Each structure stands twice: as C-alpha cells, then as structure tokens.
C-alpha cells in the first residue's frame, strides 16, 4: 500500500485506495458498478502487463496477475518512479483482497507503438464478477510518440490509434456475449469514447456506459457526427476542478467535476481525486480551468488544420531528431540530452520557428484577455450586488 495522500493544506484525503480499503469487500450484487470503480480500472490499465496477460484471449485471475507483476517489479522500484502512473499497480493489492474485484479476470492485453504512424495504444479487458466486462484503454504514457499523438487529435479526422481502438473494441465485442463498459483515463478516455461511437452497431448495443476520465475531446466534425450524438447519453465525463486536458477540443458532454488533492496540471492524476463513501466529491469548476478553457478554445479556433499540424511537427521535431523515445531520458541523461535537443532545434527552418513563436505569442495574448474578461465579470458582479437599484429589482 502506498502512503496516504495529502491535500494542499497537508490534510489526509480519501482516494481510490481508501475506497478499495473501505468498499473492496462489497460485491457488485450489493452495490452496482459506479464511477469510482471505473476510475480504479482505468488507472489499473496503466500497469505494464507485458508477459503477464496474454493477447490471445487466455484468461488469468487478478491474483495471478498481481503475483506475476510483483515478481518482475519491486515495490521500491515503483515508488522511486516519479511518473503518476507508476503507482497504479499498487491498486491490485487491495483489489485482490476483497469480494468486489477479487474474482475479476484479465484478458486480451495489447501494448503497441508504431513510430511511423505516431501511434501508442494499450488496452486490456477486465471480466467483472457481476457478469459484465470493462474494456480499458490506457492513457498517454511517457513516450514522445504518445504525447505527439495527443497533439495530432487537434488536426486529424482520425488517428491510427483511434482506428486501432475501434478494431480492438469490435474484436472484444464480437467475442463476449455480455454487457460492456468502456473507459480510460486521459487519452484512454478519448479512445474509449471514439471507439464506442464508431464501432459496429451490434457491439455498440452491448455498451452500457462509456467513461472518459479527464480525456481530451475531438474535432467538431466528430462531435457533430450522427454516431457520436447517438452515444452522448452513455458518455460519463469526469474531470478535476482545475481540468486542462479534459477541456481540450470539443466533447458536448456534461462534465462531472470532482475535487482533487493536487494543484494545476497535477490534478490530471486520477489517484488524487477525492472520494467520499462510494462516490467522488463533486465541486464547481475552478476559475483557473474556465480561463484556460476559454484561452485554449479561442487559440485553436484561430488555427486551421494545416497550422495545427505545423505547430505540432515543429514542437516535436527536436525530440524526434535526437532519437528520444521517452521524456524520462531528459532527467536520466540531463545535459547530454538537452545539448542534443538544442542542436536539433537549430535545424528547424527559420520561418517555422517564427510561426511557432507567433502562435505562442498569440496564446499569451488570448490568456491575458481571458483573465481580464474574468476579472471584469467579477467586478461587475460585485457592483451589481452593491447597487440599491439592482437589489430592488430582485
């Protein structure tokens, strides 16, 4: 078990780990599958099950998966890793103890990276004790390809990862004769929604709910499609109160905003989301999130697809030119990597450098405008509260 999580004030807070400790012995027959269970499985999908869970449909138990994983990876190794998803395997400790997930089985694990198509996708299917299955798509890992694919969502009608997600869901849906739940965290949420919208109709009929846990949205042509609109009632979108990733692009979903013990972008880590009994603690969206959402939305609206692609390719060129595969290499090799990165950056044509700087400057201006607009709204709201005329009119 990992150490307790504290909020910004240093107070102990309850997370999915506490949920498993409190409710892990409650079977689905007594308390049906709900939002916190979804996050547990979406986070568990970050676990590296290579060599443990087969891709051919062979089923293994949660206990077997846990024993195999911790025989290959020490707990000290995981705790030393600073990435947010490195702690996800510890979920198996509590899950394997209780009656809620203790009898769960794992199967059809895939973990694929295709540099040529700028695609990183991993998925796994969890067979739940209640007779349904949760198809989980992993979110963005520490790979350069994985992060670039996230940027590609802004200008491609369909990425290769999204296409592969449809294929995977169709394969699982055709093999399983049971209700399906589909979900994921971060990019995994995007893949879960996209695959569910555009999978075979016979598979879509089996889907009870689709969970996007702080997953980015889509191009408007996707959210305007008939398939997506038909899926909307089944989409459960959960974002932290200072969401950044989950408010990117379009979704048309009604977001469920939850409290996090972290600040800023660190709220993207689902293991910081706060739980009370068997539900998340819901709160209003923070002013910071509203400002970022307005700024990023305005910025992207002013760029066509070609400009978005130019920006993405230019930003990622130095990483690719140095042969860097993961961002952890920066901390591992420090100045050697930084020096190579700067040398590669000099190879970017001057006109593209200017275009990126122009776009970043535009982003800064829009951010300033959004903050000014928000503060002006606060002042006007305060004046309205203090105005006798306004009080009388109410």
Locate each region found by the language model.
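Alpha/beta hydrolase fold serine-hydrolase catalytic domain that processes acyl esters and thioesters
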Residues: 2-56, 60-124, 128-133, 137-179, ...
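Short glycine-enriched nucleophile-adjacent loop
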Residues: 192-201
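Gly/Ala-rich beta-loop-alpha elbow adjacent to hydrolase catalytic centers
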Residues: 183-188, 192
């Amino acid at each position: 078990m990992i150490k307790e999580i504290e909020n910004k004030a240093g107070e102990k807070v309850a997370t999915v780990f506490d949920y498993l400790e409190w409710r892990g012995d409650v079977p689905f027959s007594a308390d049906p599958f709900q939002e916190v269970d979804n996050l547990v499985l979406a986070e568990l999908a970050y676990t590296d099950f290579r060599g443990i869970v087969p891709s051919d449909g062979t089923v293994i138990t949660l206990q077997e998966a846990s024993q195999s994983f911790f025989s290959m990876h020490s707990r000290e190794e995981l705790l030393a890793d600073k990435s947010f998803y490195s702690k996800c395997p510890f979920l198996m400790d509590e899950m394997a103890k209780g009656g809620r997930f203790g009898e769960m089985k794992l199967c059809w694990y895939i973990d694929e990276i295709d540099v040529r198509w700028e695609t990183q996708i991993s998925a796994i299917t969890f067979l739940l004790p209640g007779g349904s299955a949760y198809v989980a798509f992993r979110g963005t890992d520490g790979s350069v390809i994985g992060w670039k694919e996230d940027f590609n969502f802004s200008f491609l009608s369909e990425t290769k990862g999204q296409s592969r997600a449809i294929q995977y869901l169709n394969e699982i849906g055709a093999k399983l004769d049971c209700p399906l739940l589909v979900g994921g965290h971060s990019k995994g949420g995007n893949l879960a929604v996209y695959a569910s919208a555009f999978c075979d109709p016979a598979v879509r009929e089996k889907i009870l709910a689709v969970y996007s846990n702080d997953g980015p949205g889509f191009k408007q042509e996707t959210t305007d499609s008939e398939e997506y609109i038909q899926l909307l009632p089944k989409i459960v979108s959960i974002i932290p109160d200072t969401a950044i990733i989950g408010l990117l692009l379009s979704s048309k979903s009604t977001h469920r905003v939850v409290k996090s013990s972290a600040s800023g972008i660190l709220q993207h880590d689902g293991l910081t989301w706060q739980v009370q009994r068997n539900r998340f603690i819901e709160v209003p969206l923070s002013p910071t999130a509203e400002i970022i959402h307005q700024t990023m939305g305005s910025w992207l609206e002013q760029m066509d697809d070609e400009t978005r692609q130019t920006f993405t390719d230019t930003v990622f060129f130095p990483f690719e030119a140095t042969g860097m595969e993961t961002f952890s290499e920066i901390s591992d090799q420090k100045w050697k990597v930084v020096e190579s990165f700067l040398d590669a950056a000099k190879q970017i044509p001057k006109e593209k450098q200017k275009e990126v700087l122009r776009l970043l400057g535009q982003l800064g201006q829009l951010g300033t405008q959004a903050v000014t607009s928000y503060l002006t709204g606060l002042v006007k709201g305060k004046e309205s509260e203090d105005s006798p005329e306004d009080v009388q009119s109410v």
